[in-house]
Amino acid sequence: MAAVREVGSKAELEAAAGGARAAAVHFWAAWCEASKQMDEVFAHLAVDFSHAVFLRVEAEEQPEISEAYGVTAVPYFVFLKEGKTVDTLEGANPASLANKVAKLAGPASVAESAVPASLGVAAGPAVLEKVQEMAQQNGASATSSAEDALNKRLEQLVNSHPVFLFMKGTPEQPRCGFSRKVVDVLKQEGVEFGSFDILTDNDVREGMKKFSNWPTFPQLYCKGELLGGCDIVIAMHESGELKDVFKEHNIPLQPQGSKNEEAVKAKPDTEKSGAVSEPALLTAAQKERLESLVNFSTVMAFIKGTPEEPKCGFSGKLVHILKQEKIPFSSFDILTDDEVRQGLKLLSNWPSYPQLYINGELVGGSDIVMEMHKSGELKKVLSEKGIVAKESLEDRLKALISSAPVMLFMKGTPDAPRCGFSSKVVNALKQAGVSFGAFDILSDEEVRQGLKTYSNWPTFPQLYYKSELIGGCDIVLELEKSGELKSTLSE
């Protein structure tokens, strides 16, 4: 059997791959079961394609190499020709691995007639046997991995451009009237945008419906947040709000010189969009009504839709933050009253929505509130104004520890652990059938350091049951080994 070579440094990898016509690199981790399974497939492929170079890198032990090749999860494969990356693969997909190796290295040494069409010419009998074994043993985990991979792909698509449109067809050839209308709006706004034709990929088409909780297409995103479909985009365009949203998020708008746009510019003032740019004034009655609304509640959110059913991603983000901070607030749906929608832009001198007010004073839109939330400034402002009681670190830790009967403080999330020890504890809890809450200590340094003192336990992960510390990774694994884990967490 041709050996898969373990690589211990970036220089060693570059030397091995640089001198080879074709090289495949497997980034793996000892704690990852999927890595072990894919490593067997990788080893069999090394036999079938003995004229190529096969290398292994333990991702966590070689951070310099992992960072150089953009590795954020395992198993991960990089395919190189003469030292240059030509393709990659993330996740446990033996069929894809076999096909990518075949494409990289050329025909295998096995007879093509022995290989099913589903794997192309990539795999020999040993690989096929391993694929079948993995399919039988890991059907459920493969489905989960596929869903995770799809969600990651969707997130990458949504964030690939500041403005991104999921549509039927292409901007040059829309395949439905609604998609055509949104493309026309974006062109009139003079904004550059990326797009994806959902007719070419049913996984993306169906996945986006769940991802966005929006059942139809087109779907327009700005800075990763859903603005809405055709009707909402057209309404925002006609009111001038779409342009305001782009400006608020520092998205450049290109001046358009077409005849159509000259005609738009020549329209009477009454037909122009963008209320803020007009020299209109509020009447005394309008101003009184708006001031009454912004002071209706101590914390007042002007959003599209309702807190239960936000009608745009930015409004949804704001509502989520307020709920996460446990801030009591009232709201007003600006889609139900255009006089309020346009008038509040003038009163606040703020061109877009949502808008958050505290004690009648404008705090800002979703981006500003998000930054304040991340930095802790939002809670500080609310505490200073007496809206929420100032929470001590100890109180916060107690609240977090008691937020679930079984609570795990870990690096990363249960779906994407960021260290081997955290991954082992997550796997142990899942195998024991224990439901648990989790907190990513990498997301909050104050919690990370505070919990060490509070629990008198210096490392992570830390597992709690009914607010009492059970222990770290070693203790959890001992309980699992002795069969006591589930009973300990259900007494």
Curated annotation (Swiss-Prot):
Q: Which organism is it from?
A: Oryza sativa subsp. japonica (Rice)
Gene Ontology biological-process annotations: intracellular iron ion homeostasis
InterPro entries tied to this protein: Glutaredoxin, GRX_PICOT-like, Monothiol_GRX-rel, Thioredoxin-like_sf, Thioredoxin_domain
Q: Where does [2Fe-2S] cluster bind?
A: 419
Q: What is its main location?
A: cytoplasm
Q: What is this protein called?
A: Monothiol glutaredoxin-S11
- What subcellular locations does the record give? Cytoplasm
> Function of this protein?
May only reduce GSH-thiol disulfides, but not protein disulfides.
Provide this UniProt record's keywords sorted from A to Z. 2Fe-2S, Cytoplasm, Iron, Iron-sulfur, Metal-binding, Redox-active center, Repeat
Family in the record: Belongs to the glutaredoxin family. CGFS subfamily.
* GO CC entries: cytosol; nucleus
Where, by residue number, does glutathione bind? 411, 448, 460, 473-474
Is the keyword Transmembrane helix assigned to this protein?
no
Gene Ontology molecular function: any one: 2 iron, 2 sulfur cluster binding
Cross-referenced Pfam families: Glutaredoxin, Thioredoxin
Give residue ranges for domain Glutaredoxin: 151-253, 287-389, 394-491
